């Protein structure tokens, strides 16, 4: 089942639990706007190259639409649509005043020079500048993009609309980026894990973790979890996978990955088959890489008691069912990885106010939001006698549905 089908399925289950009117259900599912543009740029060798860019603006009932822009060879309209919809529910679960959006360009950023990436970003911005904006749609980084990409978008957008730092988040600090934004998703994963374990009478200290993915989210989650006494016993990234049953020295691994661009070759752990990472023995599994990695083929072999979905849509519905029967507790993506968009909201607020916060305030506010959201999610679980994923979906869908009705759009 692809990401869009799985997301639609979860939405429909939540709508049924909430007893939503069929017309309202249909209107909440259909995106507000889908944008597809061609971006032709001159390459460094003088030839022309053409790329297709997408932006799906899913819902704006609760505020400006919000979501990342990814650069990847396999950017797929269905996946972008699914991720835009997930952002709508995620921002509602986090109780921040946004709707959902997502964008992307079908390209391989590793095969483009910095100047080619800049030209591509500027052309894409020129094509969509009148459809995004501070109070309309606020992009952010995603796979294959980062603070520099956001700086180019900000600059190009500002040529048309005047200097507008709040039009994108995840910017460099020198252009109005927020302190704490780089660590935000990983820190949110840690706060969410704490909240879940507390519910089960446990703490992070002494728990054995396996983390799939050691990019921004996975590496920050590993660092913060290890600082809380968690034992990271296995890690993987695009270069390979490593294991140390006594616990990996995370500061040493972070130093190694910075120098060698990956976990491969780290001498403080043994190399293992990357395909086995999800089924390694542990207490808590943190998928922090791609979607759809936990499926019916491997779900029965998973040994973890808890799964923290740091990635978007890492568990497909078939695996969900298998794991539920095994008693595995899954902290769903639309809550678990919402730290990033929450601190993006803080960045947007700081830009609009023209007043920047200290990092301690950013982190304290993030903890407050993550703790409150978990309590709200658990209340929905009790109300509807459902698991955490349906608790999160009913919480998010209900908030968007109520805003839609209040604005007079649900008739």
From Swiss-Prot:
PROSITE patterns: GLFV_DEHYDROGENASE
GO molecular function, one term: copper ion binding
InterPro entries xrefs: Aminoacid_DH-like_N_sf (IPR046346), Glu/Leu/Phe/Val/Trp_DH (IPR006095), Glu/Leu/Phe/Val/Trp_DH_C (IPR006096), Glu/Leu/Phe/Val/Trp_DH_dimer (IPR006097), Glu/Leu/Phe/Val_DH_AS (IPR033524), Glu_DH (IPR014362), NAD(P)-bd_dom_sf (IPR036291), NAD_bind_Glu_DH (IPR033922)
Any GO BP: response to absence of light
Keyword Hydrolase: no
Family: Belongs to the Glu/Leu/Phe/Val dehydrogenases family.
UniProt xrefs under Gene3D superfamilies: Leucine Dehydrogenase, chain A, domain 1, NAD(P)-binding Rossmann-like Domain
Keyword Phosphoprotein: no
Keyword annotations of the record: NAD, Oxidoreductase
Gene Ontology cellular-component annotations: mitochondrion; plastid
Name the record gives this protein: Glutamate dehydrogenase 1
Transmembrane spans: none
Reactions that this protein is recorded to catalyse: L-glutamate + NAD(+) + H2O = 2-oxoglutarate + NH4(+) + NADH + H(+); L-glutamate + NADP(+) + H2O = 2-oxoglutarate + NH4(+) + NADPH + H(+)
UniProt xrefs under SUPFAM superfamilies: Aminoacid dehydrogenase-like, N-terminal domain, NAD(P)-binding Rossmann-fold domains
Domain of life: Eukaryota
Cystine residue pairs: none
EC number: 1.4.1.3
Gene behind this protein: GDH1
Catalytic residue positions: 102
């Amino acid at each position: 089942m692809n990401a869009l089908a799985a997301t639609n399925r979860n939405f429909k289950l939540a709508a049924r639990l909430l007893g939503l009117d069929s017309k309202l259900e249909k209107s909440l599912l259909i995106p507000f706007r889908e944008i597809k543009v061609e971006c032709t740029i001159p390459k460094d060798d003088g030839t022309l190259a053409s790329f297709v860019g997408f932006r799906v603006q899913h819902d704006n009932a609760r505020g400006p639409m919000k979501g990342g822009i990814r650069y990847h060879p396999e950017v797929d309209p269905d996946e972008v649509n699914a991720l835009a919809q997930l952002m709508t529910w995620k921002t509602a679960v986090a109780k921040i005043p946004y709707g959902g959006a997502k964008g992307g360009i079908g390209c391989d950023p590793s095969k483009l020079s910095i100047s080619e990436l800049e030209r591509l970003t500027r052309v894409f911005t020129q094509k969509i500048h009148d459809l995004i904006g501070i109070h309309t749609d606020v992009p952010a980084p995603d796979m294959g993009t980062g603070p520099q990409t956001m700086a180019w978008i900000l600059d190009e957008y500002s040529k048309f609309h005047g200097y507008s730092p709040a039009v994108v988040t995840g910017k460099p600090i020198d252009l109005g980026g927020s302190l704490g934004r780089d660590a935000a998703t990983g820190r949110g994963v840690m706060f969410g894990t704490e909240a879940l374990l507390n519910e089960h009478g446990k703490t992070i200290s002494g728990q054995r973790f396996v983390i799939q993915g050691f990019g921004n989210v996975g590496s920050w989650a590993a660092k913060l979890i290890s600082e809380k006494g968690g034992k990271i016993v296995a890690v993987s990234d695009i270069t390979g996978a490593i294991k140390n049953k006594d616990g990996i020295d995370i500061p040493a691994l972070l130093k190694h990955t910075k120098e060698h661009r990956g976990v491969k070759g780290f001498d403080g752990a043994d190399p293992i088959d990357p395909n086995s990472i999800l089924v390694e023995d542990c207490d808590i599994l943190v998928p922090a890489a791609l979607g759809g990695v936990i499926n019916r083929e491997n779900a029965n072999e998973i040994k973890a008691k808890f799964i923290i979905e740091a990635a978007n849509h890492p568990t497909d519905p078939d695996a969900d069912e298998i794991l539920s029967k095994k008693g595995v507790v899954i902290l769903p993506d639309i809550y678990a990885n919402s730290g990033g968009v929450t601190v993006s909201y803080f960045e947007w607020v700081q830009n609009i106010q023209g007043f920047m916060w200290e990092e301690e305030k950013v982190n304290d506010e993030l903890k407050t939001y993550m703790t409150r959201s978990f309590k709200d999610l658990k209340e929905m679980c009790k109300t509807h006698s459902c698991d955490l994923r349906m608790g999160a979906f009913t919480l998010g869908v209900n908030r968007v549905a109520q805003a839609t009705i209040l604005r007079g759009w649900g008739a």
